[in-house]
């Protein structure tokens, strides 16, 4: 059965922690470009994408479901009706590739989790969507592992650089500029962002495009 790939997305005023280096319009364009990269990767891996948007939004050839509920409530409402496989994939993981996602949806466990930075959860794959309930924010990775255990579901943790890198802070742009080949990396470069070595570390600077 073809996995359903649910991608939560905030179209308006996203990525507020980047507001020091991007205007609101730029952040909205950037978030949309990252979403495009994620949709492309999950589609290439054989999943059917579904965008779970916080406000009305249109994506060509992709179904969009609008909800004003918080993230976990919105996801759990959807999961209750899903007896088939479901991939929950955050929209700010623009380094995602067909190969990285295929590795996740090929897991034999009931639940496969890709951890994110700082204890977060970047992706969850469920053999049966209705078997699970999400609990995002805070230490969501540990909470999701505990939920799998409490429900007697087998669990596999997927170690994936491509799916580990999520974009929230200015320093996160470094990995995207170095490793990214999709629309979001191209957009960043068109904005004038580029990596630079400073005091032995790589940072980003912005020049006039």
From Swiss-Prot:
What pathway does the UniProt record associate with this protein? Cofactor biosynthesis; coenzyme F420 biosynthesis
List the molecular function annotations (GO) for this entry.
Answer: GTP binding; phospholactate guanylyltransferase activity
Q: Which reaction is the catalytic activity of this chain?
A: (2S)-2-phospholactate + GTP + H(+) = (2S)-lactyl-2-diphospho-5'-guanosine + diphosphate
Organism whose genome encodes this protein: Methanosphaerula palustris (strain ATCC BAA-1556 / DSM 19958 / E1-9c)
How would you summarize the oligomeric state and partners of this protein? Answer: Homodimer.
Q: Which family does it belong to?
A: Belongs to the CofC family.
InterPro entries, per database record: CofC, Nucleotide-diphossugar_trans
Write down what this protein is called.
Answer: 2-phospho-L-lactate guanylyltransferase
Q: Which UniProt keywords apply?
A: GTP-binding, Nucleotide-binding, Nucleotidyltransferase, Transferase
EC class? transferase
* One GO-annotated biological process of the protein: F420-0 metabolic process
Q: What does this protein do?
A: Guanylyltransferase that catalyzes the activation of (2S)-2-phospholactate (2-PL) as (2S)-lactyl-2-diphospho-5'-guanosine, via the condensation of 2-PL with GTP. It is involved in the biosynthesis of coenzyme F420, a hydride carrier cofactor.
- Sorted alphabetically, which Pfam families does this protein's record hold? CofC
Question: Could you tell me the EC number(s) of this protein?
Answer: 2.7.7.68
